[in-house]
A protein has these predicted regions:
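Conserved N-terminal alpha-helix of the aminotransferase class I/II PLP-enzyme fold
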Residues: 18-63, 85-86, 90-91, 96-98
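PLP-dependent aminotransferase-class I/II
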Residues: 102-159, 166
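Glycine-rich loop at the start of a catalytic domain that most often binds anionic cofactors/ligands
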Residues: 51, 70-78, 96
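Conserved PLP-anchoring active-site segment centered on the Schiff-base-forming lysine
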Residues: 73-91
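Short, Lys/Arg-enriched N-terminal segments with co-localized hydrophobic residues
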Residues: 1-4
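Conserved core of the PLP fold type I
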Residues: 55-75, 108-109
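Hydrophobic beta-strand scaffold residues
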Residues: 81, 104-105, 164, 171-172
Length: 172
């Protein structure tokens, strides 16, 4: 059966719950998460915070919202975000970087959505040049969109992390 089953990864919005999922939703304990009264959201946020050794976590209902909040937290208006030219934050988030954070974007040509650590030092703007945006954040993703499901190797992440540290860049 599974050999012939197609799995649609185009978007998280194309999925449909099976009857057991619908039943679980009907029986779930509910509350207002804004007031800290939703036990399911509270449990999820506590579990994720513990997993990552953080004081707290915030549940976001979409990847786009999560990305835009992270970018806003890491940047100031006028800063620059460095990312691959195929990245979701550039291609599919409605200009959110400019609209929500007031930042410009520097696009790098990577390999199926993956940039290399060596590209970062050449992408960073001169911090003493008042005519250029302040390079502040590098954004990475394991893309299932235009990169066709390509994933970074952990060693690549580590090398990019070091390049970001070397150039005082935040990493998302």
């Amino acid at each position: 059966y599974l050999r012939h089953m197609a799995i649609d990864f185009r978007s998280d919005t194309v999925t449909r719950p099976v009857p057991a999922m619908l039943q679980a939703m009907m029986q779930a304990k509910l509350g207002d998460d804004v007031f800290g009264e939703d036990p399911t959201v509270n449990f999820l946020e506590e579990k994720i915070a513990d997993m990552f050794g953080m004081e707290a976590a915030v549940f976001c209902p979409s990847g786009t919202m999560t990305n835009q909040i992270a970018i806003k937290c890491h940047t100031q208006p006028g800063d620059e975000v460095i990312c691959d030219e195929l990245s979701h934050i550039y291609q599919y988030e409605g200009g959110g970087i400019a609209f929500n954070s007031g930042c410009s974007v520097k696009l790098l040509k990577g390999d199926l959505g993956r940039i290399a650590a060596a590209q970062i030092k050449y992408a960073v703007n001169n911090r003493n040049d008042a005519h250029r945006a302040y390079s502040k954040l590098v954004s990475l993703e394991n893309t299932s969109n235009r990169g066709g499901g390509s994933c970074y190797h952990f060693k690549s992440f580590a090398a990019i992390r070091k390049a970001c540290d070397d150039h005082e860049l935040k990493l998302h």
